[in-house]
Amino acid sequence: MSTAREQPIFSTRAHVFQIDPTTKRNWIPAGKHALTVSYFYDATRNVYRIISIGGAKAIINSTVTPNMTFTKTSQKFGQWADSRANTVYGLGFASEQQLTQFAEKFQEVKEAARLAREKSQDGGEFTSTGLALASHQVPPSPLVSTNGPGEEKLFRSQSADTPGPTERERLKKMLSEGSVGEVQWEAEFFALQDSNQRLAGALREANAAATQWRQQLEVQRAEAELLRQRVAELEAQVAVEPVRAGEKEATSQSVEQLEARVQTKDQTLKNQSTGTREAPDTAEREETQQQVQDLETRNAELEQQLRSMECNLEEARAERERARAEVGRAAQLLDVRLFELSELREGLARLAEAAP
């Protein structure tokens, strides 16, 4: 077997239909999904075929003859009649471009089949030097590779493809009676089914992503609100610190005044002890000393409180800076989430508009 017979000249995907053999009016789909439809060159028999396989079954096995005509019945649907198979095939494509490519390749193969028949009738050897078909997968093989006794058999086989006048009229009537509107609807229906399944999957994924992003957005908003409250508390604490500093200054001044008073008393006592005057007032001196001790204790306590407040103030300032940084990061993340949510909404809107 020739390798050219096993390799397609051109391949595409389409929804395959056959005319109802009973009514000759309705189309019967070959399946729910698009199938691969290919042009093949059979070098052994020197013929071109259109073949489509569904599972283990050949859905289309049509030999292209010069008498065949491929008819576009809509922007995405085309059909041709095969008199040898006694049926009409229909193909529904996903786009008009694919239909045009298939129709152009049909004309090329049809012309190549005509030239092959003419050469075989003349008894000459024919090669495909000037008539090589453009292949999407492999280079085409020669149109005719046999000579001699096999030509008579080839001539008889291809001549049998030519329909008689009665058969031609019957095929014309079959095509005219075919429901073009139903054909278009069938092809569009299967194409739209595939498209809708893809869109539905994309919408489900987008909705799931949107729900997740909304949840993350709510969490970020809650964290941002907590950080704002923490910053407000720290600012309130910082506002109280200057008042405590003023209280310390007043206490320090009182301590200084009392220390000066104690020094004055000590000097007076010293003067009295060196003179011949009366003994000092012991009760007043003890009272003054007790006041000095109390003031010194109070001063030490205030200094300890001041150091503690200064440490707290530094910690509060550092905490406030950290909180501000956290608020800034949260605000940036919130902006990013809002932007992503906006893009998601636009994408969903485009998908909804594109959906039929």
From Swiss-Prot:
Compositional bias annotation for Basic and acidic residues: 258-268, 278-288
MF (Gene Ontology): G protein-coupled glutamate receptor binding; identical protein binding; protein domain specific binding
Organism of origin: Mus musculus (Mouse)
Every WH1 domain range: 1-113
Keywords: Coiled coil, Cytoplasm, Phosphoprotein, Synapse
UniProt keyword annotation of Lyase present: no
SUPFAM superfamilies listed in its UniProt record: PH domain-like
Transcription regulation is among the record's keywords: no
Subcellular location as annotated: Cytoplasm; Postsynaptic density; Synapse
Function: Postsynaptic density scaffolding protein. Binds and cross-links cytoplasmic regions of GRM1, GRM5, ITPR1, DNM3, RYR1, RYR2, SHANK1 and SHANK3. By physically linking GRM1 and GRM5 with ER-associated ITPR1 receptors, it aids the coupling of surface receptors to intracellular calcium release. Isoforms can be differently regulated and may play an important role in maintaining the plasticity at glutamatergic synapses. Negatively regulates T cell activation by inhibiting the calcineurin-NFAT pathway.
BP terms from Gene Ontology: G protein-coupled glutamate receptor signaling pathway; negative regulation of calcineurin-NFAT signaling cascade; negative regulation of interleukin-2 production
Coiled coil: 94-122, 191-353
Any one annotated GO CC term: cytosol
Tissue specificity field: Expressed in the cerebellum, hippocampus, lung and thymus.
Phylogenetic placement of the source organism: Eukaryota, Metazoa, Chordata, Craniata, Vertebrata
PANTHER family: HOMER (PTHR10918)
Name recorded for this polypeptide: Homer protein homolog 3
Spans annotated as Disordered: 136-169, 244-295
One matching Pfam family: WH1
